[in-house]
């Protein structure tokens, strides 16, 4: 909401959380959220649904679309702007961050 280069936000989430999320958006005055939709069975399906929704509210087929997963919710305006500038220059962009989760490999294929 604080990044001036962002004009609209579409959120795909678990169907049972839509009303709760709408209330959060209202309570925190996140006015750039234009649509909250039910996501799909997978992350990929949720992305497709969000892109279809974004296309409905887009004013131009030349708009830049950024996709952000909710697993790493804390990003700053600089990262968003860097991605936009990269898309403007190269036509695409992807952000990679150092892994912070714990990765475990089970050689016995049993639960950890």
Predicted regions and their residues:
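Short, glycine/serine-rich, charged loops/turns that create anion-binding
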Residues: 16, 71, 100
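Conserved core of the sugar-phosphate nucleotidyltransferase
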Residues: 74-112
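Active-site-adjacent loop/tail segments of enzyme domains
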Residues: 38-41, 70-79
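Structural beta-sheet core signal
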Residues: 10-11, 67, 92-95
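Residue-level signal for inorganic ion chemistry
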Residues: 50, 68-69, 98
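Short beta-strand-to-loop acidic/aromatic patch adjacent to the donor-nucleotide binding site
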Residues: 59-71
